[in-house]
Amino acid sequence: MSDDNLAEIRDEKAKKIQHPKGKLTAYERLNLLLDEGSFSEIDQHVTSEENPDGEAVVTGTGTIHGRPVFVFSEDFSVMGGSLGEVVAKKILKVMDHALEARAPIIGIKDSGGARIQEGISSLYGYAQIFKKNVEASGKIPQISVVVGPSAGGAVYSPALTDFIFQVQDIGQLYAVSYTHLTLPTKRIV
């Protein structure tokens, strides 16, 4: 199966989840952002055992008005866009490429936060991403585009970037949900 076919199959599955919510897929977002035909995916075949067809992030490079950029687009249709060890490694790799090329990094955020099933390794992944955000600060432009939830650990990386754009009525940034505050204490906050 070719890389294009794999991406197409994955995107068709994602459309069934995202479109009813009024949201685009990770690939659709990248295709709208980047110059037509310029997207080149990085690490498409890097997956975890839980998600052999693709992980909760699409990473790569492309151009905007002919200028090179590096991108990652979180995929909420795969485990709620949650960050686990493999997702973190893919994001860190594309951030490293951006630093080496002295090109902007654009993160399209649509994530329920840490992949709790993976325990501490998902939190370590966030720590590494935050460290990379700080390392890149003042060296390359870092841009966050919030197109869905950015919960828990997923909220801190955008706060460390240079610019944050948020889709009205759909994009959300929060460290903890209302349910997480009220459920354990049984108190109205």
Language model: regions and residue ranges:
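Short hydrophobic transmembrane-like helices used for membrane targeting/insertion
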Residues: 188-189
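Terminal-region recognition feature
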Residues: 1-143, 149, 154-156, 160-172, ...
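Conserved small/polar residues in nucleotide/adenosyl-binding loops
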Residues: 179-185
